[in-house]
């Protein structure tokens, strides 16, 4: 796995346990070639810096998604290994399930359960598909992501910081239940460790917490920030990073804050939701999103608290402080700075 220059974490499991984990999940390359039609383009679900993901069908009828590391990739080997060792030890209904692994003939492949509705961003930000997400489904997605993060941060045998939580890394099953995926950048915390530091900041602009972008500091509260951004996106149907890829002058956090202070935040609720739902619940979710995206990591709620806030409207919420706002990228495409949203 990639070395961190500081705060190196002691692994909570031994290399011998790692080997046993890998060996127990091995599958042969011939089975995967047959399942994916020889990794046919027609079965390709998507592609990233690590390589491609293919849909496949095993002989027993199970549908799978095969993540294949590109042979030309240099940085992906460590991330693939990291993902394998992490996900194999994590079991939760709101995390994507690792089925097996193949390490034959210079191939490096991770085999996951197939999640039919693809990623959240492909539905939420598609003008035709977003109508499939009524308020009940959106609330279920928000709550499911929260429970998955609570498990990673507090309830699993490992304490895991995802570091790349975003709409494209949340998959939706047949019933639109969310499953957090892509653990290539995730990090383990051992013992009493509460944060890590890295000189190589990786992630997606618009979802990364300010302390991570500016100083390389990451913790469970970095994931809480990313979750808050996603909550605001799910309620409004707007991308936070639109202002970095278009001529929009302000990001979603600033927009929500301006409407919050003006008492008009309900105007930002996705209009495709219509009127047959509780706008109060939607506004409460936006309130939670603002609490999660405040600049001070210590002020952001733990995910267990977020789950409680979502589970009962009798849990009182404190007034949200000004969220962190990303200044718009300049015309040359260079990195922009972060600031605090103004009222």
Question: Language-model features: where?
Answer:
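Conserved eukaryotic protein kinase-like
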Residues: 1-343
